[in-house]
């Protein structure tokens, strides 16, 4: 037997073992642990309405109607297959132009809110293009518009927002946030 033939058997066996280990055992183990420890996350954090999936708590959706709260700006129009955004440096003139355009759009949609009070997350693009959450300040900044369009009182809308504020992860990481889809589902219930 040649040296090449002596190596062939162990290489084939090692390949087979690695395929089974990495392609079957490891994924099955990780899936099993995820299903046991955090089933909602493992299943995609899906949100149902009348038995139909209407979205995910983890992936943002575009809301353009004035009667609903709006999320972060998405460079990819919330298409999950192409996650990402133009990551402009602060010195890039295109970032300034894009932000100024967002501010102008904000002023058209929300004339009662002074520009100096516009939360940054409503006029800057999401890094992933899929952010499902906004800051509580961003939600409260939209109350006048939503109240006008839906005839829900401002006080009631503020209470809805307050009830949907999620704290920091583990009390340490990130910032307080409001899930836009869940918030808008509550608004939809109130106007039906």
From Swiss-Prot:
Transmembrane segments: 14-34
Bilayer topology annotation: Single-pass membrane protein
Disulphide bridges: none
Keywords (A to Z) from UniProt: ATP-binding, Cell membrane, Ion transport, Membrane, Nucleotide-binding, Potassium, Potassium transport, Transmembrane, Transmembrane helix, Transport
InterPro entries given in the database record: KdpC (IPR003820)
Gene Ontology molecular function: any one: P-type potassium transmembrane transporter activity
Domain of life: Bacteria
Keyword Transmembrane: yes
UniProt keyword annotation of Metal-binding present: no
Any one annotated GO CC term: plasma membrane
Localization terms from the record: Cell membrane
Family from the record: Belongs to the KdpC family.
HAMAP family registered for this protein in UniProt: KdpC
Described purpose of this protein according to its UniProt entry: Part of the high-affinity ATP-driven potassium transport (or Kdp) system, which catalyzes the hydrolysis of ATP coupled with the electrogenic transport of potassium into the cytoplasm. This subunit acts as a catalytic chaperone that increases the ATP-binding affinity of the ATP-hydrolyzing subunit KdpB by the formation of a transient KdpB/KdpC/ATP ternary complex.
Assembly and binders: The system is composed of three essential subunits: KdpA, KdpB and KdpC.
Protein's UniProt name: Potassium-transporting ATPase KdpC subunit
